Each structure stands twice: as structure tokens, then as C-alpha cells.
């Protein structure tokens, strides 16, 4: 299924990262926090301003982003894969 988010929404797939302690010990999955990095899969057309103009989003498909994981981030299953749908304002940075 193809998904097209509306307005300033962004669809993100979590990017799992191996977690190690400072001493080099790999943490098991249940001892790790969920990563707050992901790959942008789809973006909406943009934020609608009070003037009625549409401001395009700063992120684009393929970007690796760092985001706030919490209230306002919707988890959905698309074709058996968990994705996150969030507002662009929930994205803190683009990793380059």
C-alpha cells in the first residue's frame, strides 16, 4: 500500500541502531530505549499558513531524521511494517 500523508505530516520508519555501553557491551533489545532516528518514507504537501499559502516541508523522502517520540506520534502498520506518522514539528533535526 502506498501512503500519502496530509498537510505537514511525515511518515517515518524507525532505524534500529546497535546500542553499546561506554565499555563496549552490547545491550539486549529489552534494555534499550526505542531509537529516535528514522528514515522519511513520505511527506505531505506542506503546512497551511494563516494567509492560505502552503509552506513546503523542510524534510524530504530519504532523509534520516531525529525526532521526539511521544505524544502526537501515531504508530501504524502498513503492509506489516510499523511506521510512525508525525507532524514536521516533531522532527528535531536531519542527520547529514
Swiss-Prot record:
- Per its record, what are the GO molecular function terms? ATP binding; metal ion binding; protein folding chaperone; protein-folding chaperone binding; unfolded protein binding
Taxonomic superkingdom: Bacteria
Organism expressing this protein natively: Chromohalobacter salexigens (strain ATCC BAA-138 / DSM 3043 / CIP 106854 / NCIMB 13768 / 1H11)
The UniProt subunit note reads as follows:
Heptamer of 7 subunits arranged in a ring. Interacts with the chaperonin GroEL.
Q: Which NCBIfam families match?
A: PRK00364.1-1 (NF001526), PRK00364.1-2 (NF001527), PRK00364.2-2 (NF001531), PRK00364.2-4 (NF001533)
The name under which this protein is listed is: Co-chaperonin GroES
* UniProt cross-references to PANTHER family, sorted A to Z: 10 KDA HEAT SHOCK PROTEIN, CO-CHAPERONIN GROES
Keyword list (alphabetical) reads: Chaperone, Cytoplasm
Q: What is its main location?
A: cytoplasm
Known function = Together with the chaperonin GroEL, plays an essential role in assisting protein folding. The GroEL-GroES system forms a nano-cage that allows encapsulation of the non-native substrate proteins and provides a physical environment optimized to promote and accelerate protein folding. GroES binds to the apical surface of the GroEL ring, thereby capping the opening of the GroEL channel.
* Keyword Repeat appears in the UniProt entry: no
Q: Which gene encodes it?
A: groES
Q: Which family does it belong to?
A: Belongs to the GroES chaperonin family.
Query: What are its GO biological-process terms?
Result: chaperone cofactor-dependent protein refolding
Which cellular compartments is it found in? Cytoplasm
Q: Which CDD domains match?
A: cpn10
What cellular-component terms does GO give this entry? cytoplasm
Write down the PROSITE patterns for this protein, in alphabetical order: CHAPERONINS_CPN10
